Regions:
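General detector of N-terminal leader/presequence modules that precede the first folded domain
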Residues: 2-176
């Protein structure tokens, strides 16, 4: 795939734009609360340009890219994490993978996403339908990958990732 650079023609312009995408980790209350803040505007815009996605497709896959980026904050060395949504709605599903270096890649299973009428809000649950979320961790020192699987409860990438953490890893979480 030929990667498109939506930010500037020169290397200097591209590097300057890339400097704005950041991942910040922090701890509060003597380590009782961990947090990650991410700015991934450039990453999502490059994803949109590379996959030639429309607004709805960018919204869906972009949220998954950001979720994978946030989840990659807990990885080390050559570890990878894969997020897979399999669902019955028009999206059909998506796959996103991230590594410990913050590199994210992914794709939608159904492009373009068919809509019956113009959207009047950002509720994407009708496009997901029923289905499952699988999170697979490929840890460098492990012989086999670890996979956790939960039913889609909300039809929302952020809420379903938080539900995965609560259900599968017993870690109360929030993605916003």
């Amino acid at each position: 795939m030929q990667k498109k650079k939506p930010y500037g023609k020169t290397l200097k312009e591209q590097l300057k734009a890339g400097a704005r995408d950041r991942l910040h980790k922090f701890m509060l209350a003597d380590g009782a609360v961990r947090g990650v803040i991410m700015n991934g505007t450039r990453m999502v815009n490059e994803m949109r340009a590379n996959h030639e996605l429309g607004i709805l497709e960018t919204l869906v896959l972009g949220r998954a890219y950001l979720g994978a980026g946030l989840m990659s904050a807990g990885l080390k060395s050559n570890d990878r994490i894969a997020i897979q949504f399999d669902c019955s709605g028009p999206i059909k599903g998506l796959v996103v993978e991230a590594n410990a270096f913050g590199e994210v890649r992914g794709y939608l299973k159904n492009v373009p996403i068919q809509i019956d009428k113009p959207l009047d809000n950002f509720d994407l649950s009708p496009f997901f339908g029923a289905g499952f979320l699988s999170v697979t961790k490929h840890l460098e020192d492990a012989k086999h990958p670890f996979t956790g699987k939960v039913m889609l409860k909300y039809g929302n990438v952020a809420q379903d990732l938080a539900n995965y953490y609560l259900t599968s890893e017993q870690i109360p979480s929030a993605f916003t």
